[in-house]
Amino acid sequence: MDEDGAVMIPVEGGRRFKEMSVGKHMLNYDSIVVLTHFKGHAMGGFGGSLKNIAIGCADGAIGKKMVHAAPDNEDYESWLKGEPFMENMVESAKATIDHFGKRIVYINVLRNMSVDCDCAGVRAAPVKAHDLGILASTDILAVEQASIDMVYTSPEAELHDLKERIESRKGLRQLSYMNELKMGNDQYELITI
């Protein structure tokens, strides 16, 4: 989306950012489908639809740097594993979500989940949970909360490493901060189809 540059779009109600830099071509679309392989993530604790929007729609030259930038006086490794990074990701995603409004559908595929992100390639930890299902919603918080709830109610032996990764990186802050920013509803109903 950023082949021809970037544009700044507002982060409504943002505490960390007032605007986010996204790929210029995003303005050419009136809707978006977010198809996500839900899994662990080295920095985010877990990678769901929010992480994909936050990092995927932020442009490479400016937006991604905004999300990953720690204050000058912070130890970067500690900062990256804390709540401020999660809040940066949430606000980055909020800009895109606000831009599209109700014209977004989120699909989280909870299959072949590992503690590591797909970007780790062949170095990724082995798959522990093979198939928990596919969740879809037009509410970002509902689909992420339901995904996390399915992980946390799975047998401990299958997803212990993933739960540990989520907690060690403060990944659940993604959910609580989305709730604080009124980005969706953490109450949901699962409907089997």
Specify the residue positions occupied by each region the protein language model found.
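Extended, low-polarity segments enriched in aliphatic/aromatic residues
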Residues: M1-I193
